[in-house]
Design a protein with these regions (language model features):
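N-terminal "arm"/small-domain region of PLP-dependent enzymes with the aminotransferase-like
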Residues: 1-30, 35
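PLP-dependent aminotransferase class I/II
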Residues: 8, 20, 37-43, 47-53, ...
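Phosphate-binding glycine-rich loop
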Residues: 28-77, 91-95, 101-103, 168
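Structural detector of well-ordered beta-strand residues that form the stable sheet scaffold
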Residues: 54, 79, 100, 153-154, ...
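PLP-dependent aminotransferase-like
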Residues: 68-157, 164
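Hydrophobic/aromatic ligand-binding patch that stacks against planar heteroaromatic rings
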Residues: 91-92, 145, 169, 186, ...
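Conserved active-site segment immediately N-terminal to the catalytic lysine
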Residues: 155-190, 218-222
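Short beta-strand-to-turn element immediately C-terminal to the catalytic PLP-Schiff-base lysine
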Residues: 179-180, 194-199, 239
């Protein structure tokens, strides 16, 4: 079986270093908000060219805590994409605000700024662009809208650690950015984790309170908070992987280039597009085809794993029926949900594996 993501293979390359780090944590006797967490936060802030990084328990909490810390809640609207993982909208609902969806660009799969502007109302407080699959969103246009209408911008960068937009790292392009360290992410741990990056010191202070029960000092609280802390063990693992992220992302880009080289002539497949002023880090390599089911079945028969991202747009989810969206409201997003699928992509793919994947895709073209 050729796996969509091969975490076992990937972690074998850092296993000894991780075990050494875990042993250090065990010996320290300090397992929550210790020196490893502090070191990770400082290194990520420096890498992403921001002044603050606040680690939390997972990427979803990163979004929820950021929205709450920015004062977004009941009666407010936040614009985001309907073509993404559920947490992007769920976090908005969790703080009592209303998610408002805008359609996406058919080539990058990210928010279409022109459609975003049509959705802005007097209740709109923020925009959450998602850097989907590792492709940076149109941040200049989104930030321009935010400035024009006095809105906040929260980057959902959960799939995009290491992506670059016009020379600037994703995670430094809005009022705050949220990352996930779920195991399958480009920078992941052996469990859950997340981090929020910002250059707003007051926001970072509020986030640190929120992640630890609203604590100002031990046993004293000035607000209702959460229990959302990154464990020392996960921070230690992430420090090891942080040293590998440039190499891993570079390998992903190499595999992506190779897919594009050999599949570019296939009329039944539309390949992901990388904008010239951006660095896509291919968290997933998703191709588009009106023959999706046929191609996926051929790959399954050849023991090649695939995945559909995402089969149901968020505006059509049962839980959001009350928002009164209908099929056809976001035609680009809805067509992607019917045609897009992911093929294997990870740093330790091999040429022979990739050649086999490419051959199956090419052999099963046509009607």
């Amino acid at each position: 079986m050729i796996n969509l993501v091969d975490l076992g293979r990937q972690f074998q390359h850092v296993k000894d270093d991780i075990l050494h780090e875990i042993e250090q944590v065990i010996d320290s006797g300090n397992y929550i908000l210790g020196t490893k967490v502090e070191e990770l936060e400082k290194k990520i802030a420096k890498k992403l060219n921001v002044s603050e990084a606040v680690s939390v328990a997972n990427g979803t909490d990163a979004l929820v805590l950021t929205l709450e810390a920015l004062g977004i809640g009941k009666g407010d609207e936040v614009i985001t994409t309907p073509f993404t993982f559920f947490a992007s909208a769920e976090s908005i609902s969790r703080v009592g605000a209303t998610p408002v969806f805008a359609d996406v660009n058919p080539h990058t799969f990210n928010l279409d700024p022109s459609d975003v502007e049509k959705r802005i109302t007097s209740a709109t407080k923020a925009i959450i662009p998602v850097h989907l699959f590792g492709q940076p969103a149109d941040m200049d246009e989104i930030n321009s809208l935010a400035k024009k209408y006095d809105l906040l911008v929260i980057e959902d960068a959960c799939q995009a650690f290491g992506s670059i937009y016009k020379g600037k790292p994703v995670g430094s392009l809005g009022d705050a950015a949220c990352f996930s360290f779920f195991p399958t992410k480009n920078l992941g741990t052996l469990g859950d984790g997340g981090i929020i990056t910002t250059s707003n010191g007051k926001l970072a202070e509020n986030l640190r309170k929120l992640r630890a029960h609203g604590t100002t000092k031990k046993y004293y609280h000035d607000r209702i908070g959460y229990n959302s802390r990154l464990d020392e063990l996960h921070a230690a693992i992430l420090l090891v992987n942080l040293n590998k992220i440039e190499e891993w992302n570079s390998k992903r880009r190499d595999w992506a280039d190779r897919y594009k080289k050999y599949l570019s002539g296939a009329s039944h497949i539309q390949l992901p597009k990388e904008e010239n002023d951006r660095k896509h880090i291919y968290h997933l390599f998703c191709i588009r085809s009106k023959q999706r089911e046929k191609l996926m079945e051929a790959l399954r028969a050849a023991e090649i794993q695939t995945g559909v991202y995402y089969p149901c747009c968020l505006h059509l989810q049962e839980v959001y029926k009350n928002l009164n969206y209908q099929k056809g409201d976001f035609p680009v997003a809805e067509s992607l949900s019917k045609e897009l699928f992911a093929i294997p992509m990870h740093p330790y793919l091999t040429e022979s594996e990739q050649d086999f994947i490419i051959s199956i895709l090419l052999q099963n073209g046509g009607n």
